[in-house]
Structures are given as C-alpha cells and as structure tokens.
Amino acid sequence: MSGTRILGTAALALGVAAPFAEAPTPASAIDVPALARMVASRQDHVPAVEVARWIRDRRPGLRLIDVRPQEEFSQFALPTAENLPIESIPGARFSDDEIVILYSEGGAHAAQAWVFLKAAGVRNVYFIAGGLADWFDDVLHPLLPPEPSAGEAERIAELVELSAYFGGTPREAAPGEAAARDEPESGTAALIANARRRGC
C-alpha cells in the first residue's frame, strides 16, 4: 500500500475526530491527541496481507466488517465478512474479546467508522487503510519482483500461497517495475470488475 493512501486515510480519520475534541459529551468524548498518536504510529490499521493470514488461520475473535452499502457487499465481500453499513455502526454491539477489522472500497468510510467505534469505547478495532484496493493489489494479485533476492524467497512464497488460497493470481513485474509502482494502474471499481470476471 502506498504512503499517499495511508496519509490520506489518516487525515480523514483525524478530520472526523476533530469535532469530538471541540465539544465532547459523555456519549461521544474522544481523546483526539491519543487518536493522533495511534494514527502516527500506524496502530489504527492492519495491512490487507495480515488480515488474509488471520482469515486463513481462523484467528479466534476475528470479526471482519464491511461498512459498504448492502448492494455492494452482495456483489463482492471478503471471506467471513459481515455487512454493517456505516450508518448502522452506532447501533452495533461489540465485545472486548473481539478483534474488529473494518473495511470499505478504498478505506475512507472504514476510517470514519473506526473513529465512531473508538468514540464509543470499542478497544480492539482496526481498519484496512486501502480497503478492497489493497486486498486486490496485495492479496489477490500481488506484484512479484522479477529477480527476488534469497532473503525474499519466504515472503514471496507466502504471497503466492495466500493469493492461491483466496482465488487470485500473482502478477509478475517487469525489471524495474516493482520499485516504481506503488499505486494500482486503475481505479478500485475496475479492479473489482476484473476480479469478478475472473471469478474471485
């Protein structure tokens, strides 16, 4: 995932949190400086590849939540995910023994939902910062280096295994391409459409 995508999502999350800092109430008070520290240290999100490992390994307590509208969820969703559209998040119930992972198409709504849940006191909540774009780029169709070093072999083998597990196909980079490309070539909607055509 690119640094630009992380910074954009982080800025959005803090922008959503700012009104809580100005006029806190017992129901919505939130420690914005603490949130800012979490965002700065990347404690607010989890990489898509890590979430893929947790799904594959059936990590206890994992609760994967898709905050997109139901019609989008019904077209494509991550394995084991439940649909809680963002407007229904305030009424949802969560327990302390759950690890809640939020995602949306590109990450913006998941970041907003993360702020809402932090304001509500949910402890173990994170989001996939790049949303489905990261899932398609990093899990289903990871870009593999053309000439991997010996030290990369184990990581690449795992990426290939995860891609196959979830029905994807890795992409092979041309020489020099892996270092130059950190953004998808097309929009998220196109990636999703292509994956649907491939049956993912």
Positions of PLM-derived features:
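Rhodanese-like catalytic fold shared by cysteine-dependent sulfurtransferases
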Residues: 1-49, 57-62, 70-99, 105-200
